[in-house]
């Protein structure tokens, strides 16, 4: 039988974790001084006066490199718990992890062939 009271701790945690940030924003909005001026509107660069335009156009190469890094980072996050409990899980989970790794290898070969890993 499905009982809703089993999830009371989850709902309490969800409400508390939602109310605390909202309260922090409300309190900071009420208590913060409202002072606007040229110093508040300028960009902050480690206490140094900004030189030139604050907007710099990045090349798309940085984004592609970061995206490939995130893919391999997520792969590590998923494979670490599997590796820690490898002896308990069995052969079926090994095959699933192998399929997961093969899909990521195909993706990395595709990124390599497309030149996403080239930094020239």
Swiss-Prot record:
GO terms for molecular function: NADH dehydrogenase (ubiquinone) activity; quinone binding. One of its GO terms (biological process) is photosynthesis, light reaction. It catalyses: a plastoquinone + NADH + (n+1) H(+)(in) = a plastoquinol + NAD(+) + n H(+)(out); a plastoquinone + NADPH + (n+1) H(+)(in) = a plastoquinol + NADP(+) + n H(+)(out). Keywords: Chloroplast, Membrane, NAD, NADP, Plastid, Plastoquinone, Quinone, Thylakoid, Translocase, Transmembrane, Transmembrane helix, Transport. Pfam families: Oxidored_q4. It is a multi-pass membrane protein. GO terms for cellular component: chloroplast thylakoid membrane; NADH dehydrogenase complex. It is found in: Plastid, Chloroplast thylakoid membrane. It is an enzyme of class 7 (translocase). The chain crosses the membrane at residues 9-29, 64-84, 88-108. Its EC number is 7.1.1.-. Belongs to the complex I subunit 3 family. PANTHER family: NADH-UBIQUINONE OXIDOREDUCTASE CHAIN 3 (PTHR11058:SF9). NDH is composed of at least 16 different subunits, 5 of which are encoded in the nucleus. NDH shuttles electrons from NAD(P)H:plastoquinone, via FMN and iron-sulfur (Fe-S) centers, to quinones in the photosynthetic chain and possibly in a chloroplast respiratory chain. The immediate electron acceptor for the enzyme in this species is believed to be plastoquinone. Couples the redox reaction to proton translocation, and thus conserves the redox energy in a proton gradient. This is NAD(P)H-quinone oxidoreductase subunit 3, chloroplastic. The lineage of its organism: Eukaryota, Viridiplantae, Streptophyta, Embryophyta, Tracheophyta.
